[in-house]
Amino acid sequence: MFQNNPLLAQLKQQIEANKEYVEGKVKASDKNFGFLEADKKSYFIPPLEMKKVMHGDNVKAVIKREGDKESVEIDSLIDPMLDRFIARVRFNKDGKLQLAVDHPQIRLNIPATTHKKVTEQLANDDWVVAQLKSHPLRDDRFFFAQVTEFICKADDHFAPWWVTLARHQQPRESVKTEQSYTLQDQSPREDLSHLYFTTIDSPSTQDMDDALFIEPITENAIQQGWRLVVAIADPTAYIAEDSNIEHAARQRCFTNYLPGFNIPMLPRELSDDLCSLVPNKKRPALVVYIETDLNGNLIKDASFHTAWVESKAKLAYDNVSDYLEGVEQAWQPDCAELKQQIYWLHQFTQARIQWRSKNALLFKEQMDYNFELNADGSVKSIQIQYHRIANQIIEEAMIIANICCAQFLAKHAKTGIFNSHAGFDPKNYEAVQTFLLNTLATDENRSELTDLFSPTQLATLDGYCAMRRYIEDFPEKFLELRLRRYLTFAEFKAEVAPHFGLGISHYATWTSPIRKYGDIVNHRLIKQVLLNQPIKHIESTILARLQEARRQNRLVERDIADWLYARYLLPIATQGVEFDCEITDISRGGIRAKVLENGAQIFIPCSTLHENKDEIDFIPEEIALYTKGEKIYQIGQATRVKLTDVRLETRSVLGNIIK
C-alpha cells in the first residue's frame, strides 16, 4: 500500500530537506568516540558512528541536536583516509590475518587477505604494503584489506629505510646494470687532461661529478681577473636517450642520499666509476670556461665545450678548510700545483661571496646533522656538519656555473630546466608588509619602510632582494622563520624565470648529472646547441615528475630521520635529560623544538605549558602563544627542554619546557 505513494515520497522529501548536513574530516580520540572537524567548528561523533569511519576519512554527516549538545550521524564517504597504506602484521587468537595501520591516530586492526604475488610467510610485526578493499560507508561491509607487497621482517634493523621507501613508493635498489657500457657520444672532444683539475667532496663520496681548475687572467703581468674552468661529468656520453637507464633515471629523478648509504639515480658502474671524476682517470666531461674580474663580475659570455679531463687530486672538505683556516697540524697540499690551485680558488671564492652579498643574496648559515651508524643500522652518534670555507669554494663555483648555464640556454636554446622561485605567494604580500612594519617600523622610518615593503616592491626580484638586505642584521630568529611561511615553493620551469631565494635572474643546474635528471636534460640541450642540432623542448611531464620526486625524497629523508632520532633517544627517555633547543613550530596542540646538539625534534604538548590550558591563545599570524595578553612562546625562541618520553611505534619524541 505504501509503494509509489506520493504522500510518502513527499514526507521523505520534507525529512531530507529538514536535515542539516556538514562535511569535514574525522579526527579520532584516545577513546572510542571522535570528532568531525568542519570549517571553524568541531562536532562530536558518538562511538557507534565511529565504527563506520576511521581517522582522516573525509565524510558527509547530518547534524543532530539534543538540547544544547550537538553531534553528527555519518551519512556518506567523500574520500577515505586509506587507499594504499603501510601496516604491521597481526594474527588474532584464531590465527586470522589482521593489519595494524602504521599511523599514530589509526588504532583499529583491519582484517586482511594476502595477494597471491606475496610469497613470503608472514609473521607478527612484519612490515607490509596493503590496499584497502572495502569501507563500511562505501561497500556496505566492514573494513577489509589485502596485503600487496612484503617490505621486511619484524627484526630487520634497516626497517626505517625499507618501510619509509615503500611508503613513498621509492626504489630501494640501484638501477639494473648493463652487461657493458660503451661511449655513445663520439663527437670530438678537447683534451684538457693536462690541466690540474681537483675535486673537493666528503671522504666517502664515490659519485664525483664536478672538478675545478682556475688561473689568473693577466695583462702586462698585472692580474685583471680569474678564469675558472668547471668540468662536469658527462653521463650522457654513455646513456642513449631512449635507453632503459634513461627511462629509469627519468622516473627516479634524483640520487637518494640516506643515512648510511645512497640509492643512485644511475647504475653504480656509471655513477661511482665510469662517469665519476676519480683521480688520475681520463673521463668525458662537459666543461665551461668562466671569466670574471677581480670583483667577481662576469666579463664575457661563458664558453661550453665537450672535453676529456683528468682529476689530479680528490680533496676532502674538512682537510681543505683546516688548511685554509690555519688549524694546527692540519692536512697540507702535497705539491706546489695543488697548493696554488687551493689558494687561487680561495681568492676567487672570496670575490664571489662579496659579489653575491651586493648583487644577489647569500644563504643563511645553517647546521647539518649527520648520522653515524653502526653496522646493524643503529645510531652510533650524530655529528654537526658546519658549512666551512671549502664548502663555500664548491658552492660559489657551482652557483656561477649554473648562472652561466641558464644564460646560455636562455640565449641559444630558448628552453631548459630552469630553477625558479617567485618569493612570497602573491596572496601573502599585504600580510608580509603588515608583519614587517609591525616588527621593524618606528615613527621615523614608517613611511620609508611602507614603500620598501610594498606589494609592488615585494613582487619584483630587486624589491625582494632590497627587503632581504634590510632585514639581514635583525638579531631575532623569529623574523626569518615567520617570513618563510609566506613563501611560495621553488619550481622547475621550461622557460627562464628569476630565483628570488638566490636573488638571481637566471639559474639552471647542470653540475650534478650523476645525481639529478634535470641536469642530464640540460646537458643534452647544451650539446644540441654546440652541435647545431634541433632543440627539443621540455615536456611538462618531466617538470611535474621532477617536482614530485623532489617532494618524495624530502619526505623520505624526514621520515627516516624521525625514526632514527626516536631509536637514538629511546634509551635515555626516562633519565630526565635536558637539551638546549630552538622553537621551530607552534600550533594549538603544542610546540615543536629542535635540539641544537643533534637536530632532533621534540614535541611539547600544550597541556604542559600552562596550568590552565584555556588561558592559552595561539596567534597564527605571529606563530606565538599568549596567556592573558602576554606572549610566552614564539617561533625562533631559545628554550630548554627536558626529554620525557619516546614512542617508537609513532616515531614521536616528547618533552617539557624547563620554566
From Swiss-Prot:
Function: Involved in mRNA degradation. Hydrolyzes single-stranded polyribonucleotides processively in the 3' to 5' direction.
Entry's localization field: Cytoplasm
GO biological process, one term: mRNA catabolic process
Annotated ranges, domain S1 motif: 576-658
Identification of the protein by name: Exoribonuclease 2
Family: Belongs to the RNR ribonuclease family. RNase II subfamily.
One GO location term (cellular component): cytosol
Phylogenetic placement of the source organism: Bacteria, Pseudomonadati, Pseudomonadota, Gammaproteobacteria, Pasteurellales
Alphabetically ordered keywords of this record: Cytoplasm, Exonuclease, Hydrolase, Nuclease, RNA-binding
EC class (word): hydrolase
Catalytic activity: Exonucleolytic cleavage in the 3'- to 5'-direction to yield nucleoside 5'-phosphates
InterPro entries in alphabetical order: CSD (IPR011129), NA-bd_OB-fold (IPR012340), RNase_B_OB_dom (IPR013223), RNase_II (IPR011804), RNase_II/R (IPR001900), RNase_II/R_CS (IPR022966), RNase_II/RNase_R (IPR004476), RNR_Ribonuclease (IPR050180)
Record-linked SUPFAM superfamilies: Nucleic acid-binding proteins
Species per Swiss-Prot/TrEMBL record: Haemophilus ducreyi (strain 35000HP / ATCC 700724)
EC number: 3.1.13.1
RNB domain location: 189-530
GO molecular-function terms, A-Z: exoribonuclease II activity; RNA binding
PROSITE patterns noted in UniProt: RIBONUCLEASE_II (PS01175)
UniProt superkingdom: Bacteria
A Pfam family per the record: RNB
